[in-house]
Amino acid sequence: MGFRTLDDVDVTGKRVLVRVDFNVPMAQGKVCDDTRLKRHKETLLELQKRGAKLILLSHCGRPKGQVEPEFSLHPVVQVLEKIINQPVNFASDCIGVAVQTAVEALQNGGILLLENVRFHSGEEKNAGSFAEALAHNGDLYVNDAFSVSHRAHASVEGITHFLPSYAGRSLQCELQALEKGLGKPERPVIAIVGGAKVSSKLFVLNHLVKKVDYLVIGGGMANSFLAAQGVCVGKSLCEHALIETVKKVIEKARECQCTLLLPVDAIVGFRFEKDAPHRLYDIGDIPEDGMILDVGTRSIAHINAVIDKAATLVWNGPLGVFEMSPFDQGTIAVARHAAELSLTGKLVSIAGGGDTVFALNHAGVADDFTYLSTAGGAFLEWMEGKMLPGILALTQA
């Protein structure tokens, strides 16, 4: 990747605008999950130690270009202070005279968190005037948020046109990990793609069949693939309108010599609810009144056997309705098997996306994977092979 990093700049006494991702879940004005905050610890402490004046930019939620108190970043301050063990100042806006005054008051090593950039409509419109107003408070810019780099927004892309721009350590680390996944991976490579709908991951599937040796299709989207092969899927979620499109993906996989793995058996429920009546069926025997809610034991064994042969695993999306017991067992079993191989150094495992992170935490193995990306949309677009606007901007800055 042709961009500059923190190794290429002297930050002492400089006002450094750092784009972080503090879009964290909150309830009653309190942060519920600080995972994303922790991802930026290395970058922030390095800049602070090197005597920079840190000004942090982030969004939170979707306030639609106006001030909505429930999306304020103020509750983040106290949690961030504990994580980095440093005082953090807060500004009630992200541009304007009050911000300028707060920035001028910063000492070397001082940290200032600005209010939600999405409180201004210019952020999501990538308005040049708003990007310039943000840039006015800095001498240089650091993007440390891979998870927002698929957005051509003012604090991600627009600002790079006004300031010398660099990649932060978290962004660097993420890109290096992802390069091991699909850029220059150890082979064989297996990808697991799950989730409810094929329609949301068509671009991903079409890209992956060209890049990986084995492609496991799980979750609700597997039903459309089974239906495309003439399998009766009963009352299971199935996008019948996409059957012809799915057939093209199957054909493309064959042309690219990518082995598709579909369920050979399934846990079938008769109501869509936790602990609903259920039993194991071979895939050719799904009853008309049943719903496929998880992969079966033979399917798990097939997937694990392929993981045993693989050197690299890329995972996005659960294999079943993991939010409801007992339909989480397929995802848990495969996740634990992959984690075990990762811990012994036999497998490079990279997983990403909100549901995937949640599922791996649920399985108790999130920390055992080689790399876990907290990015949702950015991770998917990377899996599609797209160059992300925020990353492209750094290569051109």
From Swiss-Prot:
Subcellular location(s) of the protein: Cytoplasm
Gene3D superfamilies, sorted: Phosphoglycerate kinase, N-terminal domain
Lineage: superkingdom: Bacteria
UniProt-recorded Gene Ontology molecular function terms: ADP binding; ATP binding; phosphoglycerate kinase activity
Catalytic activity, reaction form: (2R)-3-phosphoglycerate + ATP = (2R)-3-phospho-glyceroyl phosphate + ADP
Pathway field: Carbohydrate degradation; glycolysis; pyruvate from D-glyceraldehyde 3-phosphate: step 2/5
One Pfam short name: PGK
BP-aspect Gene Ontology terms: gluconeogenesis; glycolytic process
List of residues binding substrate: 21-23, 36, 59-62, 118, 151
Subunit structure: Monomer.
Name this protein carries in UniProt: Phosphoglycerate kinase
Organism this protein belongs to: Bartonella henselae (strain ATCC 49882 / DSM 28221 / CCUG 30454 / Houston 1)
